[in-house]
Amino acid sequence: PHSTVPGFPWYVIGQTKKQVMESALFQNWFVNWWNAGCPRSCIWSTALKEEIRPVSKLLENKIRTFIIAPVHHVLACEMLFGIFLDQMMLSWPALGHAIGFDKFHLGWNRLISRFEKHEYGSAEDVKQWDSSFKLWLLVFCSEFIITLANFRRDQDKIRARNLLSELFESIIMTPDGEVFMKFTGNNTGWWGTAVFNCLGNILISFVLGVRIYCKLNKERPEDIQIDKFIRWFLDEITFCVMGDDKMSTYSLLIRQTFTLTDMLKVYPDCGFEVESLSTDYCHFRIMPFLGCTTTVYKNYYVPLLDRERMQASLIESNPSLEPPAVLIRINAILREAFFDRDFRQDLLLIREAWISKWNILYEDDKEWLDALRTCDSVGEIENLYLTFERLWPQGSMNRSTVK
């Protein structure tokens, strides 16, 4: 979003990406840098994530950070890879990822229905996914994207490789001014974080598929016929990934031949520490994915969020938050947690009490009136989930050509 910080060194020009991109100084510099082939120029800045963390994580002193990419890197990636990202968003869930996924408008039903073919499988929790990304995996994802982007000009390939090489040896600056170089790990917070994470997770899924296929058919990997393997994979395994989140279901033959422990060995072999979210194969409706399990509402699959997390999200660390912003927050949580009936009733009571408390004082306040317009009824939220809407019809997304 253009309202976010612009990254180093552009703070001296403006506080947001929009302010920086509108400045003549940035525009002139960017044109010269672009014409030169986008040579390496990034110093990434890092900051702590402000979030509510489980007590167990705090006791282990486990904190999370994100990395801020310079605005010129973000803009160049958007210009070069934007169409590729659009195509990925239009392709879910057929390609096994959830980029572009929207739980509303029957999106959750569409996503989960894929797992009816094989009802039992597993969901995994990979620890420190971004920081565990190995160099070979970064290189693979980079070359994969460049190949699929199918650049027509050699100069664009040079630009793409220069931009993506910033991930391999990243110069990082901490809030207190220390500078160091990072040689591995996927930078959290850059333009392609989700894309790289999904591609890495998909690759690991296919590595697992190759192992299973070779053992069942007593073949060596180098002897596999690709077309035959792909047909087998699509018939025997169903999976979906979003970043480090993954859920998979397997055919009865695979579940009878391999234990869940056998399946998870692929992660440490690829450099990741993994923990199964169940002790054995479980039904797809109780597998956590994107922070949700699945329930059925009026014959549709719908998301059921963890109640404890939703209750924690009501806590606001900023005591100066104005009543209109709090009301918007309550409405947003109500939409997310709609299918937890008891919690939904609690939220409706909280919203009613909050409006009663502040409505007279803020009755002429524009922000308060705007916040009141976000107060959807139960029926409106239900329609938001259960009414189909094709948000991005094929061919509807156009981008200006980079010249």
Predicted ranges, named:
Residues 1-403:
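Viral RNA-dependent RNA polymerase
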